Amino acid sequence: SLSSLILSEALILKKDFQAAKKIINISLRHNKNDPKIYYLAAKIYFLEDNLKKSKNLIDEALKLNEDNIDILFLLGNINLKKNLFAEAIEVYEKILKINNGFWPAHNNIGLANFELGKIELSKTNFINALKNTNNAESMLGLAIVLFTQNPDNEESFNIAKKAILSSPKFINSEFRKSELWGVEIQKITSQFFKKNKELNDY
């Protein structure tokens, strides 16, 4: 039922995955044709780093609704977390054909392209992500791209400062990792924060 799904979503937010799984398993026994149930189950396993199980469940969700942005975004994130960058980009681009204003897809294409060494493309992706929203993640991503292209670029510092003032948790490398920042961009971001130590005080 709808109330069960709402409760399981609340439990996922609280990171009470075991309780959420129990509700979802009961829901699946009663209704095997609701893509939302498979999606929520896939989300739990994704957060638990069980990517194989998450992928199997998201495939079931896609059979029932192949154009749902939430379902597609989770599939893209599974690919990104597995370092399947080209596959992730392909899924995110499918989302953008449905809704070009969905900034998280632009942002995550930027993350994938950075890992592929396509820095100029990554810059375009982060700029596109910022067209409709001043989200901290894409601002910091853009700052790191500019820093990569020119370590003495003052604009990169100013953009990063704005991002950190908006969301200080992006200073934390573990938090960035949870947001699917890959090895290459994490490495450069660490160099950036070492060079600009004053940003750690915000």
Region annotations inferred by a language model:
Residues L13-I26, L47-E60, K81-K94, E115-N128, ...:
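Structural signature of tandem alpha-helical TPR/SEL1-like repeats
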